[in-house]
Amino acid sequence: MSKYLVIPLAGYGKRFVNEGYKTLKPFLKINQNNNMIDSIIKKFPKNIKKIFIVRKDTEKKYIKLIEKYENSEIFYIKPHNLGPLYSINLIKEELKKINNIFLSYCDIHWSKKNFQIKEIKNNYVYCFKGWHPFTADNNNYAFCKTKKNKIYRIKEKESFTKNWQKEPLSIGLFFFKNGEEMVNSIEKVINNNLKINNEYFPSLAFNFIKVKKVKFVDYFCHIGKPDYFEIFKKWNYYASIKKIFKKKIKNLNIADEIIIPAAGLGKRFLDENINIPKYLCRVGRKKKRMIEVIYEYLPNKKHPYLITLNKKLNYLDGKFRVVNLKSATKGQADTVTKVLNKIPKDKSIFINSCDTFSIFSLNLYKHLKIKSDILVFASQNTETDSFTNEGTWIKSKNHKIQDIFIKTKKKNNTLRLTGNFYFKNKDIFMKCYRKAYKKENEILIDNLVKEAIKMNFKVYSIIDNVYVNMGTPKLLKEFNFWENYFNAK
């Protein structure tokens, strides 16, 4: 029995246009090989019949991309701004003739183990339930009210409760058993003028279908907003490159010594009843300690100094030189000074935060290291915490840092300082430290960078390809989420 996949592509992608994207949203690349539509098509058997709905004024270059899909048909409709359901309604006469119809948004990505479409006996709304970084503070999705997988009602752009991460969230994939019933339900939405933000949505059609059930996917991501799209791309790239990078960095001469300050109190973790030091939290798919994951992204010829507070870590002795402090310090930079007496003054040092790591160009690092007194790691800050007030931001030109803004909102044309630093020698570190010590109650290495700029040291920045921050409970959850997402089969 034939099955169909309908994908409406008649939108304008205004959020992307407003952010300066030049490619129409469904055709944006999510990785080297696939655009948004490719990733959806590949979830289904090759012989499924594909129906694309496009505007009559769609550019020819996009039509050519659609025409490459085997066993497909394109329907042209008049331009409108009334949402995906209205697009579907404009080809309703064709849909009445067919059955077993999958309907998919163009801007979703999902995975489900053993996804089968051979024998589907009911109308389904495909849903995700659980913690998700994009829904932690946002319920602007469609949600289903269910009992034993039967759907009783669907809301669009709002949840039924305040605990929406425990509700079935419609991912934007639907299955209609019968074309006529599908069209009848669509007509009822439009005839009753059931618009949300002046648009008609397919989810609401299921309120007019008698028998409907929920079917859960394992993982899901909405990539229809520029920030979500960029975050998804970052983690997708991370998953594809991390194994290669970890192998390559093992032989990099990153510095003579590596220092990892880990003597903070971890207040944000304590506030959420996480009572072990954050760098010992189990993270990722393999449940390794955070500090062990960071070690994998550093050269293996070095045994980093790991500076802790009141914590004996004998089981880490094989990888780290653990230095256990008896009392709290005045901050990250102050912590680093506690091991500098063990390092000759002409030796270079690399400082890596205990909760972050980067994937970066090793060749660019080597080039910048040669001409730098201090080399600062920076990021485009593709994170869900992009608007934090606690970040430090740098302004640079041709990699040379011109200014630094500490613990403030993001400034225009700035990059996020990540927490990893190279110092040509400990004398440079100490000169900057002494200046900062006189001025600050909490001495961050960020403060040392600020003093270095004033003293005309050669301070450069390297923009990483991927910046991974696990420094708050939420960011740690995000890391775990994406690690599992891209390892799902």
Where is each model-derived feature located?
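N-terminal glycine-rich phosphate-binding loop and ensuing alpha1 helix
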Residues: 1-60, 246-312
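Conserved alpha/beta core of the MobA/IspD/sugar-nucleotide pyrophosphorylase nucleotidyltransferase superfamily
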Residues: 3-5, 14, 167-258, 267, ...
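Structural beta-sheet core signal
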Residues: 5-7, 52-53, 102-103, 125-126, ...
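Alpha-helical elements of Rossmann-like donor-binding domains used by nucleotide-donor carbohydrate transfer enzymes
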Residues: 39, 89-90, 231, 293, ...
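Conserved beta-strand termini and adjacent loop/short-helix elements that scaffold enzyme active sites
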Residues: 53-55, 75-78, 157, 214-217, ...
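Conserved beta-loop-beta/alpha segment of the NTase-like Rossmann-fold superfamily
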Residues: 59-146, 312-392, 431
